[in-house]
UniProtKB/Swiss-Prot annotation:
The modification Phosphoserine is found at residue 908. Belongs to the eIF-3 subunit A family. It holds the Pfam family eIF3a_PCI_TPR-like. Residues 588-623, 829-899, 920-971, 985-1045, 1053-1081, 1104-1125 have a biased composition (Basic and acidic residues). RNA-binding component of the eukaryotic translation initiation factor 3 (eIF-3) complex, which is involved in protein synthesis of a specialized repertoire of mRNAs and, together with other initiation factors, stimulates binding of mRNA and methionyl-tRNAi to the 40S ribosome. The eIF-3 complex specifically targets and initiates translation of a subset of mRNAs involved in cell proliferation. The keyword Nucleus does not apply. This is Eukaryotic translation initiation factor 3 subunit A. The lineage of its organism: Eukaryota, Metazoa, Ecdysozoa, Arthropoda, Hexapoda. PANTHER family: EUKARYOTIC TRANSLATION INITIATION FACTOR 3 SUBUNIT A, EUKARYOTIC TRANSLATION INITIATION FACTOR 3, THETA SUBUNIT.
Length: 1135
């Protein structure tokens, strides 16, 4: 169920009622519910919410509920910070005013309570209770009363200030209010002497300033780049500095000075002279309280310069007073110590030099000032001449004149003048410092005149100093290593510079000096001697220096002439660089100014847009509220009208008659509507009961009426059916007649158009005759272009596929080679590891075992040699029998269908088939010439891989084994005969694939490797192109164009298997190997005699050449490389 919420005006009335009956907490809860309800927060204007907020804050102040007040203030800020800032400012100021009034009232109440206690019994002022209380704690009655009565209100007021500052720190529209509240908080701390709260307030403001510097410029955010914001922050920090000085919180004052300096450095606008004068004045005061006389004098000097330059109406008296202040502050600076011992032994986070540099930055100085530099600046500004007559000689007495006997008397007169003059109260703090400086001057001057002096005499000279102060100053001088002093208390004497061998630092006299100390004289004796000798040499040789100068001048002139051009160029280059740099800097400055102008313009544009948006929002909010007020007024008016309207009705009169006048006033529109609805429901029930009785009557009457209507409806429907049938028949008859008439018209139109057919035919024939020749010409050109393009594409496809096959083969070959090399490497590594392990085991075995193993190995080697010899003899016999069988079968293997040609130079392919006709020989001649060289190269290779190895593999492995399973043993290869006949009997079957390799050479796999689509679509164009250029190398007869031979044939004519392996039974392979061996042997003589090889006939065979010995590359090699590629189909020889 939804929670009931009151309207703001009703909540205010109810809160007043709670206040009247003495329940402020209930009243505060009622108002708090309104601010927590989001429904009413933005639905009403400030004229409705502002009185509610004042009442809410009044209750919070009365009940000291600062956290509840904070919640309401934040809600009110969110509602009206963009709509009506003045309302928010009025609420906050009213809240703080109420808190201040209650705090002041509490303070007065506390004072009055103490006064009543004091005046309670005049005869018995010291009561036992007061005596015991004073013994227990050190507080008096006023302090206890303040802690009980005043302190809670002070705490509430402090929390109120903090809440308001936190509330307004990010709103640019309430920026002035924020700084006003900060000043009010400073006044609160001053009034009630709240130093801890003042420190927390300073930290809070410093944190807010850091947040402002870090945050971006939002719609309601505060930007530190604005001049107004910088000025407000600067004024607040100056007020903070004044408050800190009044409360004597010098640490906070120093932090405020740092903040002020940072704001002035951040501001692009030069601060006004009045602000700078106030800044230097406060800074000098802080330095004075910190005991830093050096920077105090520097701050006064900066203030003096600023006032003298910028203040036009400065009177002479004011100038003299300021000059005397600056002069006295400068001369009162303690004499600097050369080597402070704490700087050598104490390690701090920051060295004194870094601290001095930081303080110098606050004064705008490039480096930390010193006493000498300040005195020099004072003299440059002519300050000693600007002071009055009484102070004019002070500078000369302390810094110029050497008169130790009258020094203290002179300074005493000035001290007396300062102490007696009422207008010189500002100079009183410098008296003690001036006395200390005077005593130090006196001691230094006395040390230059006397070697020893009595204490009493020194006290007479230092008239304004006692013995304890004097001894302290003497010890300090020795401690800081400024002077050599020894005090003899027995003789009551003081000795100066007694140790002639000790000189701790180079002495540079500061102030008036008569002579150096004895130790300094001894230390500088060599320097003095060098000076005297130099002077004597100049007297003895007066022209030497002149000659040296002339010689040096000549060298300088020569050197100048040597480097003048280079220096001139360097100077010109430097000038050019400077000019370029100036231009670059100027461009950068212009760009920066343009960027700054753009940024400012963008910021102003954004500010204008934000302001315009705010105004639009305010206008929309006002319109919305006005609209809501109008709606509310209309609702109230309609409520009154509704009451009047209800009173005019019967049930309304009944309902209103039951209520008296007071009851009607207490009811609202909803309750009136509820009463009206109840009255209407009651009347409706009565009416419903009446209607039920009437319904029964009407139902009976309606049923009787419908029973009587049924015969009449049936008669009407029968008549209507007859009429509808007659109407349909008449309509159908009319439609048929219209269709017949339309057909007659269409037939007549067709007959008229038939007479135009001859003319149409004549026109079409004439048009076809005119266009026929042009069509035929275009068709012929198109077919020619189509044929050329088809041939071109077929040729490109043949070349591309051939290159793809070659690349695939080379890639497979390279992969196989790498694999085998890796296997060999692994095998070698395994062998090396096994050999190393064997060697290690052999070293561990004894001599007898090694000898026994040696004998066994010897027996095995003899047995192996015997077996090798037997194998060689057996192989020789097998080879001889194979050679005889080959010679017998050479004449029996003839092509069927004709006799062998008698020409001796026929190609090796003539014996394989019947003698071709002349046309066939001419057709295949070019292809045989191309194949000749390859056949010659392959012939020797096939002969090398002869039948010995094939037969051995068949005997040991069977017909279907491959080269991967077994190879010929090395012993058998070594035992094989070396003659050419034995080598010619070797075949190619040890290669990968066996028969497939030879089929690949003879174009078998070339067809098999092509896919189906190529064989079906591309064979025709490819064969046509091959017919134009002749047979390809190693290409067999074409399938589609080869005529059926009645007799004869060879292995090229046999059908091929689609399998890539293309393997045949072992018997068939043996027969074919025998036939190939015969053919190769038979064609060997012509191959050697012709350069084209065995691919031609007597017409195409070239002339015989002289037989040359086979080159080393063509000679058969004894040993074959087992790791070479076994699947190659090119003519590359094995290494």
């Amino acid at each position: 169920m939804a929670r009931y919420t009151q309207r703001p005006e009703n909540a205010l009335k109810r809160a007043n009622e709670f206040i009247e009956v003495g329940k402020p907490l209930r009243a505060l809860d009622t108002l708090q519910e309104v601010f927590r309800n989001k429904r009413w927060n933005y639905a009403y204007s400030e004229t409705v919410i502002e009185p509610l907020m004042f009442k809410y804050l009044y209750l919070c102040v009365e009940l000291k509920k600062s956290h509840i007040a904070k919640e309401g203030l934040f809600q009110y800020r969110n509602m009206f910070q963009l709509v009506n800032v003045n309302s928010l400012e009025n609420v906050i100021r009213g809240y703080l005013k109420m808190a201040e009034e209650h705090t002041e009232a509490a303070q007065a109440q506390s004072s009055a309570a103490v006064a009543v206690l004091e005046l309670d019994d005049l005869d018995n002022i010291a009561t036992p209770e007061s005596i015991l209380m004073s013994a227990v704690c050190g507080e008096d009655a006023q302090d206890r009363s303040d802690r009980t009565i005043l302190l809670p209100w002070v705490k509430f007021l402090w929390e109120s200030y903090c809440q308001c500052l936190e509330l307004l720190r990010v709103n640019t529209h309430c920026e002035a209010l924020y700084h006003d509240i900060a000043r009010m908080a400073f006044q609160f701390c001053l009034k009630y002497n709240r130093k801890s709260e003042f420190r927390r307030l300073c930290d809070k403001l410093r944190k807010h300033l850091e947040d402002i510097c870090k945050s971006s410029n939002q719609t309601t955010g505060v930007s530190i780049n604005k001049v107004e914001t910088q000025q407000l922050c600067l004024d607040t920090r100056l007020y903070l500095l004044d408050s800190a000085i009044q409360m004597e919180l010098w640490q906070e004052a120093y932090k405020a000075i740092e903040d002020i300096h940072g704001l002035m450095a951040l501001s692009k606008k030069t601060p006004v002279p009045k602000t700078m004068a106030n800044y230097y004045q406060k800074l000098a005061m802080v330095f004075s309280k910190a005991g830093n006389q050096l920077f105090h004098a520097a701050a006064l000097l900066k203030l003096f310069q600023l006032t003298r330059e910028l203040k036009k109406n400065l009177t002479k008296d004011d100038l003299q007073r300021m000059a005397a202040h600056v002069l006295l502050a400068t001369l009162s600076i303690p004499l600097p110590s050369a080597h402070p011992e704490f700087d050598r032994f104490i390690e701090a986070d920051k060295s004194p030099l870094e601290k001095a540099q930081k303080l110098a930055v606050l004064l705008g100085l490039p480096q930390p000032p010193t006493r000498v530099s300040l005195i020099r600046e004072v003299v440059r500004l002519n300050v000693p001449q600007l002071v009055s007559e009484d102070f004019r000689n002070l500078y000369n007495w302390l810094e110029v004149d050497f008169n130790p006997l009258n020094l203290c008397k002179r300074i005493q007169s000035i001290v007396d003048f300062i102490e007696n003059g009422s207008e010189n109260a500002l100079l009183t703090p410098y008296i003690q410092s001036l006395k200390d400086v005077t005593i130090m001057r006196l001691i230094r001057q006395i040390s230059q005149v006397y070697e020893s002096i009595q204490f009493q005499r020194l006290l007479q000279l230092a008239s304004f100093c006692n013995i304890f102060e004097l001894e302290k100053l003497l010890v300090e001088s020795v401690r800081h290593n400024d002077m050599q002093i020894r005090i003899d208390h027995q003789k009551n004497s003081i000795y100066f510079g007694t140790d002639l061998t000790e000189s701790q630092r180079e002495y540079r006299p500061d102030g008036p000096a008569l002579q150096s100390m004895p130790s300094e004289q001894i230390r500088s004796q060599l320097v003095n001697m060098s000076t005297v000798l130099t002077r004597a040499v100049s007297i003895v040789y007066p022209n030497r220096e002149r000659d040296q100068r002339a010689k040096l001048r000549t060298q300088m002139v020569n050197h100048y002439h040597e480097i003048k051009d280079r220096e001139h160029q360097r100077i010109l280059q430097r000038q050019k660089i400077i000019e370029d740099r100036k231009e670059y800097i100027e461009k950068q400055n212009n760009a920066r100014e343009e960027e700054e102008a753009r940024r400012q313009e963008e910021e102003s544009r954004k500010a204008k847009l934000a302001e315009q948006k705010r105004l639009e929002q305010e206008q929309e909010e006002r319109e919305r509220k006005r609209h809501q007020n109008e709606i509310q007024a209309i609702r109230e008016k309609s409520l009154k009208e509704k009451v009047q309207q209800i009173s005019q009705t019967a049930h309304g009169k009944k309902m209103l008659s039951k209520l008296d006048e007071e009851g009607i006033k207490k009811l609202d529109a909803e309750q009136i509507a509820k009463r009206e609805s109840e009255e209407l429901q009651r009347e409706a029930k009565e009416l419903q009961s009446k209607l039920k009785s009437q319904e029964k009557k009407i139902d009976y009457f309606e049923r009787a009426k419908r029973l009587e209507e049924i015969p009449l409806f049936e008669k009407y429907l029968a008549e209507k059916q007859v009429k509808d049938k007659e109407f349909w028949e008449a309509t159908e008859k009319t439609r048929i007649e219209n269709a017949i008439a339309e057909r007659k018209d269409a037939v007549g139109q067709q007959e008229r158009l038939k007479r135009m057919y001859p003319d149409r035919d004549e026109f079409l024939e004439a048009l076809k005759k005119e266009r026929a020749s042009l069509y035929v010409e275009k068709l012929r050109k198109f077919e020619a272009a189509l044929e050329a393009e088809r041939k071109k594409r077929l040729a490109d496809r043949i070349i591309r596929r051939r290159e793809e096959r070659r690349q695939a083969f080379l890639r497979e070959k390279e992969e196989e080679r790498l694999r085998k090399e890796e296997e060999i490497r692994l095998a070698q590594a395994a062998e090396e590891r096994a050999a190393a392990e064997a060697r290690r085991l052999e070293r561990e075995a004894d001599d007898e075992k090694r000898r026994a193993q040696y004998e066994k190995q010897r027996a095995k080697e003899e047995e192996a040699e015997r077996k090798i010899k037997e194998d060689r003899e057996r192989l020789a016999r097998d080879l001889a029998s194979e050679r005889e069988r080959t010679e017998k079968e050479r004449d029996t293997w003839r092509p069927r269908g004709g006799d062998r040609p008698s020409a001796p130079a026929v190609g090796s392919g003539e014996w394989r088939r019947a003698a071709p006709t002349a046309s066939e020989r001419n057709e295949r001649g070019g292809e045989r010439i191309e194949r000749g060289g390859d056949r010659i190269e392959r012939g020797g290779e096939r002969i090398e891989r002869g039948g010995d190895r094939d037969r051995d593999r068949k005997d040991n492995e069977g017909a279907d084994s491959s080269w991967r399973v077994r190879r010929e043993p090395d012993s058998q290869r070594a035992a094989a005969p070396k003659d050419s006949n034995a080598q010619q009997s070797r075949d190619d079957k040890w290669r990968r694939g066996g028969e497939r390799d030879r089929d690949f050479r003879n174009d078998g796999p070339r067809r098999d490797r092509d896919d189906g689509p190529r064989r079906e679509r591309d064979d025709g164009p490819r064969r046509d192109r091959d017919d134009e250029r002749g047979f390809r190398r190693n290409d067999g007869p074409r399938r589609t164009e080869e005529p059926q031979r009645e007799t004869g044939g060879n292995w090229r004519d046999a059908p091929r298997n689609a399998d890539r392996e293309n393997r045949r039974p072992a018997g068939e392979r043996r027969d074919r190997d025998v036939r190939e061996t015969r053919g190769d042997q038979r064609g060997s003589a012509p191959k050697e005699a012709s350069s084209g090889g065995g691919g031609g006939n007597w017409r195409t065979a070239p002339a015989a050449r002289e037989e040359k010995p086979a080159s080393k590359r063509d000679q058969p090699q004894e040993k074959e490389n087992k790791a070479a590629d076994d699947g190659e189909w090119t003519s590359v020889k094995r290494r």
